[in-house]
Amino acid sequence: MFYPEPVSKLIDGFMKLPGIGPKTAGRLAFFVLNMKEDDVLDLAKALVNAKRQLHYCSVCNNITDLDPCHICRDKRRDGSIICVVQEPRDVVAMEKTREFEGYYHVLHGAISPMDGIGPEDIRIPDLLKRLGDEQVKEVILATNPNIEGEATAMYISRLIKPFGIRVTRIAHGLPVGGDLEYADEVTLTKALEGRRDL
């Protein structure tokens, strides 16, 4: 179907988002076109500001507008525990439980040979450097409970063993094949409480 060029470009822009196909992109485009101009400008500003102002924390690799991030700045947290997660949104999911009081390390991915992602492509070297510099006694591996997450957890646990640091894996109160960001607080709390040594 023919759309004017600005509409086609808007649809193409929405299709670049994960999980958005042509039909959904079209619905979103027409929704935006029907919004008040001030609301559209606010949305556009929010997108541009997020892109310009956010970066990765130099300590944990979480997304932040400060460096270090607010979690790494918080001296009330337990510096002896680091929870390793795959993505920044997983930090948010863990924080919602209000159960974890240590620090985080965000990998920005998982080992996935089928997708051409090896250990050198995610933030594992940064984690090992932190373990050498800080007084860490336990690393909780909270990668997703799928093949890539499990492979990443096993790989990291082998690298950490020589440090003499306790390595635990969150319990599988989470569905296999699921993502942390979609788990509710109770499920994540149970998963944290039931973590096990690797």
UniProtKB/Swiss-Prot annotation:
GO terms for molecular function: DNA binding; zinc ion binding. SMART domains: TOPRIM. A zinc finger (C4-type) spans 57-72. It comes from the Bacteria. CDD domains: TOPRIM_recR (cd01025). Residues 80-175 form the Toprim domain. One of its GO terms (biological process) is DNA recombination. InterPro entries: DNA_Rcmb_RecR, Rcmb_RecR, Rcmb_RecR_Znf, TOPRIM_dom, TOPRIM_RecR. It holds the Pfam family RecR_HhH. Keywords: DNA damage, DNA recombination, DNA repair, Metal-binding, Zinc, Zinc-finger. The keyword Zinc-finger applies. Coiled coil: none annotated. May play a role in DNA repair. It seems to be involved in an RecBC-independent recombinational process of DNA repair. It may act with RecF and RecO. Belongs to the RecR family. NCBIfam families: recR. HAMAP family: RecR. This is Recombination protein RecR. It comes from Brevibacillus brevis (strain 47 / JCM 6285 / NBRC 100599).
